[in-house]
Every structure is written in structure tokens, then in C-alpha cells.
């Protein structure tokens, strides 16, 4: 079945009480929705008027739409558009418990909200996003900082009680497994590949000293490659995510362009501040940090994920500048193109892992048993460095390029609107067709140098079995 041409509710819209709904084997293309362009499950902002404000410690005042056990699989979801909130291709709103989004091709979708490919907004416990191809989706909004080019997982602000602010209801447990997340763009915010925010909140408030019932984000076996963020975290960005397990992923060749409005200091539109590009953790909100119990073992100022067996490689950091000697010349610095002739020429700058916004600039992430571009500046142990020897990798370049090896790069173009405020820069890059192969070649230093412990998946990106000891680092287990 082909569903196309919808102009308000998106291609498929399930409002409420749609337990066990199955959506499969469809072509859902060229639709528009105010909230969610391709497929939308539930409502993003439906308020429950019967809730007693002082007693709602679960949903924060939002209505549970009761769309449990929805299955969305084997669909072609492409070139849909969303007007706001979350989800250009697929939108999952509060009350979509135990959903599964799997084996879909989600490509070329757009949203002015968060999560151009897939958007999980609100509390929907035990969701699974697995084995999808999430390609070339874009989130952008000139007036708002919106995030998550490929996948967005986010809680909402509690509505009640209004007199005493509470943390977000959170998202519920979410697993993101074995997806290809490639070529997506969060042009006005964080997380070109994946953005997770407000995952935890009221769950922590209910048991501040006991983390066992808290919600957890699990990100395993994904290839997060060649994505781009206008702010930080071209690969993955986290905020208010207390429990996160990021294990056996390949996070490579993602870019941060520092072209979002928030990357510019006040009254300084001529040069932005460069941002880290691979995995970024932002400081917790004050409300959540004050809620976390001192005896819980998780009293950190920032999202401090478990980082195990990951390849985090060659994630590039740029910033935007106007040439002082020639104001008509502007663009990204450094210009890494092979035939560069501008004053902005230079080698790529790699910034793979970072913590932003805390009171202590020495705060750092702690990868373990991971392959990194550089071993300095991080906590953790048993990490290695060296070319991972992917079968075929590429880097982002000019929008018109077809395929480029990393050593034959072209420049990434920017399109400014100087008479506008907010996010006044749009970034144009390519290629825009599926390419590359981020499986491991023979001789890779990632082979048999990982560790098998709790939380490590027993199979890889392709479903191949991992050995019980010394698995490969990254999403691929070479067999």
C-alpha cells in the first residue's frame, strides 16, 4: 500500500487505545503532519484534566494514550514533513508503551521539531528501535534550537503541579539497537545521529537513592556515521540521561559545524565557537541534579554513560567565520578540501568525546575498551588508537559530490541569510545516496580487543554471534 499526499495528520495517525496495532509493508511518502509526517502514534500535548496535580508522579499531567505494543516494521518511510514537536518520519508520543520500530527504511524526512527520522516524545516505557536504516533526515528551525537529525528520544516538561516544579516524566526505558544511522542532520541543535534528553526525571524523584527502577537508554550495535549537527554531538548527544549504556557502536566521521545560532556569542555574528563532534554529554538540569540521591552512585553533574567497546573515530569539529581580510569570503574553518585555496585551509580537527556546561571544565567521559582517534583527555582504561580499517569509509563534503575517500575531501557549503536572526545558517553537504561500508577489514586493531561483560550484546549489527571472550570493538563482529 502506498500512502501519499496527506496534508495535516501525516500519512498514518493512530490517536488512542490502538493496542497491538501493526503497520507493515507500506510506502509512506510525501506526507505532512502538524505533529509527525509519516506515522504518528498518540498526541504530543494532550493534557489529562482529571489528574489531581499533587498526585501525578507518573505522567506529569499528560494523557496516557494507551497505544501499547504497536509494531511498525518493513515500511518505506520517505520524504515526509513534520511541523513541530517530534518525528518527521515516525512520531511516538506518550503512552506508546512496548512499541517496536524495526526493519524500516526511514529516509529523507524533515521536521521543524526534534527527531527528523524517528521521534520518541514523552513517557512510553520499553520502546525498541532496531534494525532500521535511518538515512539523510533533517531537523531544522530558524527560530528554535531543535535536535536529533536521525533519532530523538526526549521527555517533556511536567505540567503539574504548577506551584512546585517537578522534573520531566521521562521517556521510559528505550533500546536503540543495530540501526544504520547515516547522513542525518540536526541543523539547529545537537545530535546529528541521536539526541536523548530528559530521559530521567520523575522516576528518579520516586526513588532518589535507588537507581534500579530508573529509566535507562540502551544504545548498542549501531553504526552512527557521517551525520552532522549544527551544535554539538554530530554522532550522539545526551542531557538529563542518568542511566545510559552505549556499547559496541561504530561512531565515525560525524561532524559538528557550529552553525546553529546558539554557537555564536552574543553580538558576535562573524565567528562561532567550535563544538565537539562525536559523543557529547551536557550538564544535567538543576532540577534533576538536585533530585538525584547522594547515595545512588549517580550523583554526577552530567550524563555519564557507560561507554564500552565503541569505535569513536575521526569525528570532525568546525566553526563558521567571516574572513576579516575579505568580508565577502565566509565559510567553515578549517576548509579541509583537497584543492583548498582560501585563507581557511587546514587539516581536520577531531573532537570525539566531551562534557559541556558543568561547573568543572575537567569533567570528562570515560570510555573503556574502545578504539579512539586520540587517547588523551579522557578517563577510562584499556582503550586503543589506530585506523580501524573499515571496508569503505567516507567523509562529508560538497552537496554535489558522489563518493569521496577521506583523503580526497571537498568543502562543506553554508548558505547564510544575513538579514535574519536565530539559526541563520543552513549547511549543505553530501553525498545523498547510501554508500560506505563500516564493517571491519582483516587486520583491524579493533579485532578481538573488546571485553565481554554485563551489557555487552551477544550478537552484532548483522546478527552474528560474538565470542564469549575478546569480542571485536564496534558494531561489527568480523567473522
Residue ranges and their predicted role:
Residues 1-5, 18-32, 46-81, 96-110, ...:
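Right-handed parallel beta-helix
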Residues 442, 454-469:
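Extracellular calcium-associated, cysteine-rich motifs in secreted modular proteins
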Amino acid at each position: 500500500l502506498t500512502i501519499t499526499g496527506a496534508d495535516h495528520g501525516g500519512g498514518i495517525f493512530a490517536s488512542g487505545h490502538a493496542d497491538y496495532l501493526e503497520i507493515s509493508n507500506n510506502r509512506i511518502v510525501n506526507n505532512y503532519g502538524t505533529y509527525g509526517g509519516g506515522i504518528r502514534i498518540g498526541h504530543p500535548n494532550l493534557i489529562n484534566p482529571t489528574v489531581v496535580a499533587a498526585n501525578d508522579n507518573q505522567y506529569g499531567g499528560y494523557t496516557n494514550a494507551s497505544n501499547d505494543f504497536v509494531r511498525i516494521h518493513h515500511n518505506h518511510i520517505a520524504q515526509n514533513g513534520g511541523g513541530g514537536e517530534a518525528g518527521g518520519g515516525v512520531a511516538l508520543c506518550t503512552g506508546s508503551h512496548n512499541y517496536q520500530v524495526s526493519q524500516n527504511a526511514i529516509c529523507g524526512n524533515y521536521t521543524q521539531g526534534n527527531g527528523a527520522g524517528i521521534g520518541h516524545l514523552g513517557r512510553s516505557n520499553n520502546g525498541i528501535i532496531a534494525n532500521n536504516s535511518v538515512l539523510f533526515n533533517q531537523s531544522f528551525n530558524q527560530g528554535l534550537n531543535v535536535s536529533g537529525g536521525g533519532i530523538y528520544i526526549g521527555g517533556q516538561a511536567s505540567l503539574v503541579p504548577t506551584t512546585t516544579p517537578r522534573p520531566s516524566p521521562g521517556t521510559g526505558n528505550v533500546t536503540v539497537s543495530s540501526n544504520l544511522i547515516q547522513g542525518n542532520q540536526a541543523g539547529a541543535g545537537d545530535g546529528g545521529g541521536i539526541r536523548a534528553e530528559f530521559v530521567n526525571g520523575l522516576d528518579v524523584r520516586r526513588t532518589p537513592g535507588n537507581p534500579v527502577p530508573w529509566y535507562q537508554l540502551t544504545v548498542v550495535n549501531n553504526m552512527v556515521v557521517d551525520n552532522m549537527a549544527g551544535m554539538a554531538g554530530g554522532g550522539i548527544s545526551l542531557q538529563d540521561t542518568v542511566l545510559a549504556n552505549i556499547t559496541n557502536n561504530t561512531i565515525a566521521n560525524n561532524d559538528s559545524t557550529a552553525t546553529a545560532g546558539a554557537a555564536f556569542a552574543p553580538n558576535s555574528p562573524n565567528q562561532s565557537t567550535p563544538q565537539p563532534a562525536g559523543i557529547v554529554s551536557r550538564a544535567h538540569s538543576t532540577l534533576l541534579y538536585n533530585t538525584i540521591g547522594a547515595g545512588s552512585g549517580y550523583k554526577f553533574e552530567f550524563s555519564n554513560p557507560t561507554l564500552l567497546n565503541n569505535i569513536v573515530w575521526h569525528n570532525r569539529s568546525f566553526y563558521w567565520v567571516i574572513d576579516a581580510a575579505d568580508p565577502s569570503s565566509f565559510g567553515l574553518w578549517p576548509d579541509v578540501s583537497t584543492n583548498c585555496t582560501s585563507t581557511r585551509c587546514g587539516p581536520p580537527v577531531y573532537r570525539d568525546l566531551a562534557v559541556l556546561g558543568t561547573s568543572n571544565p575537567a569533567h570528562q567521559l570515560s570510555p573503556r575498551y574502545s578504539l579512539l582517534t586520540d587517547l588523551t583527555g579522557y578517563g577510562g582504561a584499556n582503550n586503543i588508537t589506530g585506523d580501524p580499517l573499515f571496508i569503505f569509509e567516507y567523509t562529508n563534503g560538497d552537496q554535489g559530490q558522489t563518493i569521496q575517500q577521506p583523503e580526497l575531501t571537498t568543502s562543506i557549503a553554508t548558505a547564510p541569510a544575513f538579514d535574519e536572526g536565530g539559526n541563520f545558517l543552513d549547511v549543505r553537504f553530501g553525498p545523498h545516496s547510501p554508500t560506505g561500508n563500516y564493517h571491519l577489514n582483516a587486520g583491524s586493531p579493533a579485532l578481538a580487543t573488546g571485553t565481554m561483560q554485563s551489557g555487552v550484546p551477544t550478537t552484532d549489527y548483522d546478527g552474528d554471534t560474538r565470542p564469549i571472550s575478546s569480542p571485536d570493538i564496534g558494531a561489527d563482529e568480523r567473522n
